[in-house]
Amino acid sequence: MKRRNADCSKLRRPLKRNRITEGIYGSTFLYLKFLVVWALVLLADFVVEFRFEYLWPFWLFIRSVYDSFRYQGLAFSVFFVCVAFTSNIICLLFIPIQWLFFAASTYVWVQYVWHTERGVCLPTVSLWILFVYIEAAIRFKDLKNFHVDLCRPFAAHCIGYPVVTLGFGFKSYVSYKMRLRKQKEVQKENEFYMQLLQQALPPEQQMLQKQEKEAEEAAKGLPDMDSSILIHHNGGIPANKKLSTTLPEIEYREKGKEKDKDAKKHNLGINNNNILQPVDSKIQEIEYMENHINSKRLNNDLVGSTENLLKEDSCTASSKNYKNASGVVNSSPRSHSATNGSIPSSSSKNEKKQKCTSKSPSTHKDLMENCIPNNQLSKPDALVRLEQDIKKLKADLQASRQVEQELRSQISSLSSTERGIRSEMGQLRQENELLQNKLHNAVQMKQKDKQNISQLEKKLKAEQEARSFVEKQLMEEKKRKKLEEATAARAVAFAAASRGECTETLRNRIRELEAEGKKLTMDMKVKEDQIRELELKVQELRKYKENEKDTEVLMSALSAMQDKTQHLENSLSAETRIKLDLFSALGDAKRQLEIAQGQILQKDQEIKDLKQKIAEVMAVMPSITYSAATSPLSPVSPHYSSKFVETSPSGLDPNASVYQPLKK
């Protein structure tokens, strides 16, 4: 490569292109690339009859599982896979096929465009509209051109996996908010305890710490001198006044702000325990302001009584009495304020605040010098109450420490019990493992026994076959021996008759044959002994098999009996329930029958009473006949007649002219 020196003075100035056109040029190429990728994937889907866009969420899922296994462990990755699988199964079962494919394809392409650097803009929205239109108009109705069963699980994953990721995102957001809330609570508690610790220090150390804080604040305020000077030139406040303010005034202002916030929250009234006294000099007034503010802070923070003292508590000291340096109390009628005193008006508060804040730096310096001895000499009743409150708080602190020790002892005992339980769990696990090992060994032994039985059966079959073969050979040998003996006898007879020369050779042959016969008989006895032993082994194995079969039969019979007993118990419980229901129904029927019988008796009694009354009335009224002289009609029957009355054993005389009551 050649090194070329460029002339800097003759560099060409690049053409300035407008940002709008640059964005258009960059984005058009990007969106053209998106359209080309989309068209290629759709073409591949049409050619191969498979939706390749469903593989992108699957690839994202594999990457997320790998990242979770790498950074969060195996347990979380397994949990994530199980949750995603469950979500996929739910989407696969409960979403229709057409809507499933439509939602999956639309989500994939929308998410693919969403991952660009442009975000939401007009081209992305137009692409989204195009994708949704193509999916809804063309591909939503055409599901027969590809493998539905193969693509359906991937489509369910395209919907289920984003649901899982959204759920985890929502969970992380909620946990983040809860963690921030917990941090704020802990920060407030730490600030409260820090204030308690600072206020528990002696006043000398408090003053030293306040001076150090003031020096640090002044050192921090030094870099802002230039800006403060500019503000002063433009009519603002110079920074020297801020630096020259003394500690009581700063603390007074800060405490005034804190009390404004507390007063807005609580508004509980003025504390009745603070007794303020007037003073003659301004130094003692400001010293009293500081003491009163400190006492109010301790009362508010330690005792917990929230007061409604605003800025008037620090500035009303000019109108009230206080002890002087020698400890003498002014005895004027304005020396003691009322315990249930009211809050002064806002105008007086503002005037007193202006008086308090308009003190010169020299007065504040004298205050800093005289603050500690005056605090040591003068102790109002508020300080006595504060000391009592501090003692109470110390007692409460000791009680809380005792409670803490008790809780720690309980925690230690619980931890020891937990350790014991864990050791017991370990022992139980070991015992369980031993039992499982024993069971495994027993199963293996059973399998080995079965294998041995099968091998012995094979050996028995082979021995039986060998025995049958040997018996056949023996029979053949016997036949051959008989034939040889017959031929030998014939030959001997023939030789004796004809010649006496071959007798010796025949005798030798006979002896050899007898020896072979003895050997064969011995072999037969040995084989028979082996066969007997094998038969004994076979019988033992058969007995073992029969015992196993008996045990299996007994176990099956036992399980059947248990099922029968369970069924009988269930049927018995059902019968008892039915009997109880029948008894309850019978009792209800008896009660209703008794009630009906009582009502019937009551009605019968009422009927008898009514009949008796009707008879009495009929006996009292005379029989009246109505006749018409002019009309030839038949006489009209009376309205009330004794014929309609039933004959009852009544003591009344129906023919009596006057009613006579019965004599009892």
Swiss-Prot record:
It is a multi-pass membrane protein. Residues 320-348 have a biased composition (Polar residues). The modification Phosphoserine is found at S305, S332, S631, S634. It is found in: Rough endoplasmic reticulum membrane; Nucleus membrane. Residues 253-274, 320-375, 630-664 are annotated as: Disordered. Residues 253-265 have a biased composition (Basic and acidic residues). Glycans are attached at N324, N340, N452, N655. It comes from the Eukaryota. Plays a role in the regulation of neuronal activity. This is Macoilin.
